Amino acid sequence: MCDDLTAIDEDLALASKGLSRRDFAGLSAAGMLTACTTTEVADAAATRETAVAIATPDGTADALFIHPAKGRHPAVIMWPDVAGLREAYRQMATRLAASGYAVLVVNHYYRAAKAPLLASMAEWRSPAGQEKLKPAIATLSPANTVKDATAFVAWLDKQAAVDKRRKIGTQGYCQTGSFAVRTAAALPGRVGVAASFHGGGLVTPAPDSPHLLLTKTKAAFLIAIAKNDDARAPSDKAALQAAAAAAGKSAEIEVYNADHGWCTLDAPSYDKAEADRAWARLLALYSGL
């Protein structure tokens, strides 16, 4: 989770690279993302990007829809991390689209403001950034996630770039790892794969804890856990494995050799090697949509 202990781990990761948090924040978004560029896709498809507005029961959600310029493709809903929809996630969605997917990367904070609320993960780690996000975070709830996911899937199924004959994938990061699971549970007829990267809140005491929802899904799961998250909640992986087994679901549940945030391009803990490994597992599962 993105808590004070995670911030300490991030400081240590930056120090190992010879950077302070001030140094990291001072890097331009373009420069940081260039430095963190992940492996390019062989024979990548040309993509098309559109800023879209999607009607939901609570208003209008802004999002980016990025897909190959030609043809119909399986759809994917990408839920950004705690810092919200921003340049890092636009680049991540573009990379996925270039692999042959119609990607909707959403602003899950739309009830509070249009994206980007923050420019980078570094801004989230500042007192001003955290204060700015408080009202937006307060709008989140399991019920709202389900409403939004239902609206997003309905919208995707109307798009010419989406192949409705194929299942939908969904992936979440940090706090939205649980959103991916809830999406799969709410729309079992459409969601074929759900992935959580350094996700939080997957195992809770609540009766609607995400791990208890696996029985309501028809999806395969990729649960990629950060090593520092695992150190703080070592029993979660076993609970997830037991829940998947009880539900009869295919689930890759693994603790990666990287810290919370390692898959997000502009995170201090970004780890290219482990991010690429997780990305390869994601594409392997998505190939079956």
PLM regions with names:
Residues 150-211:
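Primarily recognizes the serine-hydrolase "nucleophile elbow" in alpha/beta-hydrolase
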Residues 19-33:
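N-terminal export leaders
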Residues 73-81:
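Short beta-strand element of the alpha/beta-hydrolase
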Residues 1-19:
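N-terminal secretory signal peptides
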Residues 248-289:
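C-terminal catalytic histidine-bearing segment of alpha/beta-hydrolase fold enzymes
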Residues 39-68:
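N-terminal cap/lid segment of alpha/beta-hydrolase-fold proteins
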Residues 217, 223-225:
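Short beta-strand/loop motif that positions the catalytic acidic residue
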Residues 121-169:
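Gly/Ser-rich "nucleophile elbow"/oxyanion-hole loop immediately N-terminal to the catalytic nucleophile
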